Each structure stands twice: as C-alpha cells, then as structure tokens.
Amino acid sequence: MAEKGDCIASVYGYDLGGRFVDFQPLGFGVNGLVLSAVDSRACRKVAVKKIALSDARSMKHALREIKIIRRLDHDNIVKVYEVLGPKGTDLQGELFKFSVAYIVQEYMETDLARLLEQGTLAEEHAKLFMYQLLRGLKYIHSANVLHRDLKPANIFISTEDLVLKIGDFGLARIVDQHYSHKGYLSEGLVTKWYRSPRLLLSPNNYTKAIDMWAAGCILAEMLTGRMLFAGAHELEQMQLILETIPVIREEDKDELLRVMPSFVSSTWEVKRPLRKLLPEVNSEAIDFLEKILTFNPMDRLTAEMGLQHPYMSPYSCPEDEPTSQHPFRIEDEIDDIVLMAANQSQLSNWDTCSSRYPVSLSSDLEWRPDRCQDASEVQRDPRAGSAPLAEDVQVDPRKDSHSSSERFLEQSHSSMERAFEADYGRSCDYKVGSPSYLDKLLWRDNKPHHYSEPKLILDLSHWKQAAGAPPTATGLADTGAREDEPASLFLEIAQWVKSTQGGPEHASPPADDPERRLSASPPGRPAPVDGGASPQFDLDVFISRALKLCTKPEDLPDNKLGDLNGACIPEHPGDLVQTEAFSKERW
C-alpha cells in the first residue's frame, strides 16, 4: 500500500521527503491538486494541497491564500497544520525562491456536494449545517475576508459528529470594510449557480453579501436536493433569478431596464416566488430564505443577523459565536495590489518583480511551531473543492452524476498540468470574462442575439442604422407579388453560392446569346431578362430586402420571408427590376 501511495505521489509531482506516506487522490482545490496522506511524524491522516508557483498569477493566489489561512482559527474552518516547501522543508522567508508549496491541512471525510448526490438531507440536518455555515461566515467576515467561492464542494462534513467546516480559500480576498473598493476588486469568482444578481451585473463591485447569497442557495439545495438557480450561462442565471426574486429598489430597476429590458416584467411581479418554487419547504424556512436571497445586497441579512433569525433559534448561542480578534486591515491589501500589478507583466519580467519586492510577505510566510502555539489566530484552511480556477476563468462545480473524487479517479494524468486540463472538462465550458457577459450582449428589438443564431443575421443586424429610405414602389410591388411563396434565407444563399462556384462562365450569360446580350438601356436600368432560364440571385436586392426585415420591430411570420425571395429574379421577358437604381437609392 505504501509503495502504491509513493507511486501516486511521484506521478503528480509530490516531493515531501519520507515523512508523508500512503498518498491517495482527493480532488482539486482552486489553486492546486489535493492528495490525502498519512503524516508519520504526527500519526494522523492529512490532506496535502500542492500549489505550483510558476508565474505571477499563481504566486499572487498562493501568497493571498497562505496569508489568509494563517490567521483564521475557528471551529467551522478547516485547520491548516503547516506550510512546507520542496522536499518537506519549512517554508520560511521569501516564497519567490520556491517553485512549489504544500499546504498540510486537516483531513475531512466528505463534502456537502457528495452528501447531496446521495439525496435530500433531513430538514434538521440542513438546519444544523446552515447554522454552522453562518457561524463560520460570521468569523470570516469579521476578519474582513470574503470567501468568494462558497459552494457545496467547498463545505466539508464530518459524518461522525456532524461538524461542518468551510474550506478552500484559494479565491478568498481581504476587503477592509472601512474603505471603498469600487473599481479595485478583481472579478467576483463565485461559481455562477451561487452568484448573486449584483455580481452578475457588476462583477467588479461587491461586498461580503455575495457569500450570504451563496449560503442561501446552499440552504435551498440542502432542503430540496436540487440547485435553486441552475442557469446554463450568466444570462439564463439572471433570468431565473428575476423570475423568483423581487426587485424593489428603483436603482436596481433602472439598471435592469438599461441592461436587459426584455427580461423584466412591466409590473415587476415575479412569476414563481420562493413559496411556489419550493413547495416542499416550510414557511419558516421560506421566510429565512426570502431575507437572505434579496436582489439588492443592502437588504440582505448578514451572517450575524442570520444567526439571530427564528429559523436558527434551536442552535443559536451568541456567546459561542466568536469573531476575529485580529481582522485584516487596508495595509494587508497593499501586497495584493503590488502582485496584481506584477500580474499584468509578462512572465519574463517576474524575476525583476520578485527582486523589487523581496520581503513583502516574508514575515507571514514563516511557519514556526512556537508561533502557532502563541498566536490567537492560526492558519486554518480546507483540503479543497472540485475544480481548478484561474482568476479570469469560472469553472462550474460538480456534475450531477459523480462526485469530484470519483471523476478524479476515473482520469489518469502524467502531470499536474494534465490534471488541470482534464478537470476543466467537468465544467459547462462556459468562460466568464470581465466585464460581465450581460454587458457584451447585442440588444435589438428587445431580444438578445443568442450565440446559436446564424452569423449572417448577426452581421446584417449591424447595418440597421445604415438603412435609410424605404424601398422603391417597384421593389415593393415586386416583393408583394411573392409574399405567399415559401422561402428560405439560407437556400437563397446556397443557390447563389452554387451558381458562382462553377466559374465565371456559369455566373454570367454566354456572350453569343442574343437574348442575353446587354441592351443599350439607360443608366440605372438593367437589361430585360429571359423567362425561360432559371432564376438568378441578385445580392444587392437580397441585402436590401434583408435590411427591410431587420428594421421591423415586430416578429415576422414565416410567410414574410417571401420578401427575400424577390432577390432571386425570375427571368420573364419585359419584367424589369430596377436593381441598380434601387440599390443606389437604398444606400
């Protein structure tokens, strides 16, 4: 067994010396791979998280995570025993000179995601877990820390004593509440199913309330066994929220009308309130959820207020709900700002940055046993969740059928990088960038252009402003004569492409055909066409009539596509279509 564990450690590049044995895969944390192991010196099972320090971004995340977890000490936060360097050496002094770091943390039996995969929890269990979650959040927020990635996969459970512990602080962020951070926060990286509406609308402007929204979604999931808002992408996520969560404040209504007008009701009434969406949940729990899941974060309960709600009364004990005695302050964020600036530079400039700021966090990185015993707040962190995330990439949590560890065991990787790439395959492959996806949508006629629409329609829509005067009377009459004919936009295009692929001799009439020879017509008037030949595609007429359809605000029935059929001109003797003149007038 030990030999097999050592083999697993070598496969994933773990080099901790001989102190840790019997390595087994657990899953992925936000910043690295996680294996379980046995600490032969302390005689206990632990979880070891490996963080590769390969570039500015990974260095920034590692420094931030280590700094935060060293100061958090709470019953509902996973304990971190120590942070080690290569070959199991003590991680002291400058982190810049190391290529890898190992976080040795408390081993937890399972996580909430795996429990939910087995079925719905009993309400008493859900209530107990929610109390412990809020108890941990109260402490975390009092330390001026935002978790930013609360989800079932990052909440760990001991089934023996039903203790819940919050884990994986790889995306946590220090935010001193005494200072404004508007415009200085990186994109909130909560998994989109647990992302608040404010975070969807303004991904760079958020507060501790984003963690409370995620906690409310988790409670609803524990009570029902299903995700509360499971949108396929950010737009659908917001749509699902608006169908259930009322919008009360005028500033929120104004912003929604500006960003996504077609998804809001004129009366601002929700289609499926929480009581209707969750019929199996009792009224007291619904009242609790309604106070947590508010559209505006200013109306949302804080963790401390949530602990005082009647729904939490069976477990509430303010005397046993501690807060941090040494919260982070604005000066603790300075190093993050420096590292963010370094992240903008290329990896080739990283050596210069590291020499410029050689001791930025050296005191925080010294992990001495005597300091751990004396400090009132010791590093505490989880063994990690289910999916690796870069700061600009949002990966969705667990799939429905398997737990993260089961999926991890099904895959074999030869390196840390391959493991990361494979784990991204478990997501919905939806990349979230900044600014929000909602701001990038093109809105026309109160309807968003979905990414599956034909690209030609998207291109033509950009010409809406260029469309000037209406078509000529001749063109309209010619179009009206064909309104009842069945038409297909793409068949028209295909027919034209086919007619031009044969070469110039197929696209134009033979030179020796007297009936097709160009006549001496006045300028702007095309020559007569032959009625015995097959129709020809006129691109100018087609585009003009397509623009006519694009400028109409109402939805068009299928027979309206007959307007585009006029672009395919039957060759009847004497049937003159003023193509050139029409085109000039149109453009």
Curated annotation (Swiss-Prot):
It comes from the Eukaryota. High expression in heart and brain. A motif (FRIEDE motif) lies at residues 328-333. It holds the Pfam family Pkinase. The modification Phosphoserine is found at S186, S434. InterPro entries: Kinase-like_dom_sf, MAP_kinase, MAPK_ERK3/4, Prot_kinase_dom, Protein_kinase_ATP_BS, Ser/Thr_kinase_AS. Residues 20-312 form the Protein kinase domain. Its EC number is 2.7.11.24. Residues 373-413, 499-534 are annotated as: Disordered. It comes from Homo sapiens. Activated by phosphorylation at Ser-186. The active site is at D149 (proton acceptor). PROSITE patterns: PROTEIN_KINASE_ATP, PROTEIN_KINASE_DOM, PROTEIN_KINASE_ST. Keywords: ATP-binding, Cell cycle, Cytoplasm, Kinase, Nucleotide-binding, Nucleus, Phosphoprotein, Serine/threonine-protein kinase, Transferase. GO terms for biological process: intracellular signal transduction; protein phosphorylation. ATP binds at L26, G27, F28, G29, V30, N31, G32, L33, V34, K49. Homodimer. Heterodimer with ERK3/MAPK6. Interacts with (via FRIEDE motif) MAPKAPK5. Residues 373-383, 395-413 have a biased composition (Basic and acidic residues). This is Mitogen-activated protein kinase 4. Its cofactor is Mg(2+). SUPFAM superfamilies: Protein kinase-like (PK-like). It catalyses: L-seryl-[protein] + ATP = O-phospho-L-seryl-[protein] + ADP + H(+); L-threonyl-[protein] + ATP = O-phospho-L-threonyl-[protein] + ADP + H(+). One of its GO terms (molecular function) is protein serine/threonine kinase activity. It is found in: Cytoplasm; Nucleus. A motif (SEG motif) lies at residues 186-188. The keyword Nucleus applies. Atypical MAPK protein. Phosphorylates microtubule-associated protein 2 (MAP2) and MAPKAPK5. The precise role of the complex formed with MAPKAPK5 is still unclear, but the complex follows a complex set of phosphorylation events: upon interaction with atypical MAPKAPK5, ERK4/MAPK4 is phosphorylated at Ser-186 and then mediates phosphorylation and activation of MAPKAPK5, which in turn phosphorylates ERK4/MAPK4. May promote entry in the cell cycle.
